[in-house]
Amino acid sequence: MSEDYRGHHGITGLATKAIHAGYRPDPATGAVNVPIYASSTFAQDGVGELRGGFEYARTGNPMRAALEASLATVEEGVFARAFSSGMAASDCALRVMLRPGDHVIIPDDVYGGTFRLIDKVFTQWNVDYTPVPLSDLDAVRAAITSRTRLIWVETPTNPLLSIADITSIGELGKKHSVKVLVDNTFASPALQQPLMLGADVVLHSTTKYIGGHSDVVGGALVTNDEELDQAFGFLQNGAGAVPSPFDAYLTMRGLKTLVLRMQRHNENAITVAEFLAGHPSVSAVLYPGLPSHPGHEVAARQMRGFGGMVSLRMRAGRLAAQDLCARTKVFTLAESLGGVESLIEQPSAMTHASTTGSQLEVPDDLVRLSVGIEDVGDLLCDLKQALN
């Protein structure tokens, strides 16, 4: 077993870190990958004398420890906690960072699952929230009250791909003693590292780009704040929403190719966005890589690429959006995102149905594309036939 769970020293390249951080070849066997420790419990040398710090798999597992070290390293963080899903990570963060009577600011187009958790669960515990367009710093500033404890940031947002200035919001948070959490799922650490920009916590649904193959569900919290990490760890263990060793293995395997995959996602997405922007059936294309996007300059400053997510609005409305989703052959009609295969969905009826009737309701003419890493010519041909 390797004793190195905190990454390699002296390595600066992100692609190299993603491959090597968290584990070195096993000194006994030479295995270059972390073994999958399918054990629920671990033998002790004496009462309370743990081997390598492991006692029970909910509390810790060598495979999960390696994944957490890798995630911390690629986000330029000190601490990371892995969870069984992105929503489990979200729930942990909210329970640690908020108390009854507190107030949280959220994006006015926040992910539907996050909205449902806050609106249906945390409001029962007397937690208030205010949806705000986070691209408008004056609106964020105006929403802060004496009870505000957290600003929940998505950038780019899901599904409208709005951009928030992480550095400016981080400065605002510090000025008012408000923590800033950034959901970095859409960008991934390959394109954006929020801790380096002033965020206190980074959240991931590792199901998406980090896992990258649509074969595992997971989540993560990364921070440089030891007190927060200890609180996250307490709930991770106490509530028990942890990934299995095999899920941790799949996630870590996906992480190794993240940088390479994101390069192709970026290339394909900008090509798709430019094609859609010129199509008469499309009234608007939402993609931060287009110079016409209102957040383009901020995205170019804080990201190393614009990502693989593209949203569009159909000129003929809801039924046209449904028809487009039904007609594609290469783009699969499915929820989720970030895998190697291209996906298409209508958020108002699928991933964001929980926002219907609320301030966060998603337009029903909106279609969201998760642009995969296939040959871009095939993707364009598929969209052409579906639109025509």
Curated annotation (Swiss-Prot):
It catalyses: O-succinyl-L-homoserine + L-cysteine = L,L-cystathionine + succinate + H(+). GO terms for biological process: cysteine biosynthetic process via cystathionine; methionine biosynthetic process; transsulfuration. Its EC number is 2.5.1.48. Its main location: cytoplasm. GO terms for cellular component: cytoplasm. Keywords: Amino-acid biosynthesis, Cytoplasm, Methionine biosynthesis, Pyridoxal phosphate, Transferase. The modification N6-(pyridoxal phosphate)lysine is found at K208. GO terms for molecular function: cystathionine gamma-lyase activity; cystathionine gamma-synthase activity; pyridoxal phosphate binding. The keyword Amino-acid biosynthesis applies. It is found in: Cytoplasm. Its cofactor is pyridoxal 5'-phosphate. Binds 1 pyridoxal phosphate per subunit. Belongs to the trans-sulfuration enzymes family. Catalyzes the formation of L-cystathionine from O-succinyl-L-homoserine (OSHS) and L-cysteine, via a gamma-replacement reaction. In the absence of thiol, catalyzes gamma-elimination to form 2-oxobutanoate, succinate and ammonia. Homotetramer. This is Cystathionine gamma-synthase.
